[in-house]
Amino acid sequence: MHITARVDYAVRTLLEIARAPQADKAVIGATAVQVAPVVKAEAISTAQHIPPKVLETVLAELRRADLVTSRRGPDGGYWLARPAARISIADVIRAIEGPLASVRGERPEDVRYPGAAEPLQRVWIALRVNIRAVLENVSIDDIAQNRLPGFVETLTADPGAWARR
């Protein structure tokens, strides 16, 4: 699997926003609510070493996917559109690059092979199932809190996981 620079930047952007200090509570009516931290693009760019123009594009894609919200002006910036625990790495990849797995630009279930290659479609489907198993079950919050799911820790504890092949 190839993780593009834009996906890497998008995940790091969301992590930077998720880790921002929480703002004070605001009182709306009779209820105190936590105000989401607002993070400026410049702060994200500096903290994560993301080129500003690239970050601008990434933030626009995250906004279109309803993963972040923004406000202009001197008090403006970006904040998560929903709790970090409800944003999976799969959500981020889909927002930036589209489907998690594709074959020649098509979804695996839409690819057909003749003759001896016919079983290959099932291999691509199985690959997608396994990619989903990890990416849909790891959230921005899991990473921000350095609290990866147990199955991820188990997979990465195997020395073979780190071997280049």
Predicted regions and their residues:
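Conserved segment of winged-helix/HTH DNA-binding domains
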Residues: 84-109, 121-130
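Residue cluster at the C-terminal edge of the helix-turn-helix DNA-binding motif
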Residues: 64-67, 95
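Beta-hairpin "wing" of winged helix-turn-helix
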Residues: 66-80
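C-terminal regulatory/oligomerization modules of transcriptional regulators
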Residues: 109-165
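N-terminal helix-turn-helix DNA-binding core of bacterial DNA-binding proteins
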Residues: 5-51, 78
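Alpha-helical residues within the helix-turn-helix
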Residues: 46, 63-64
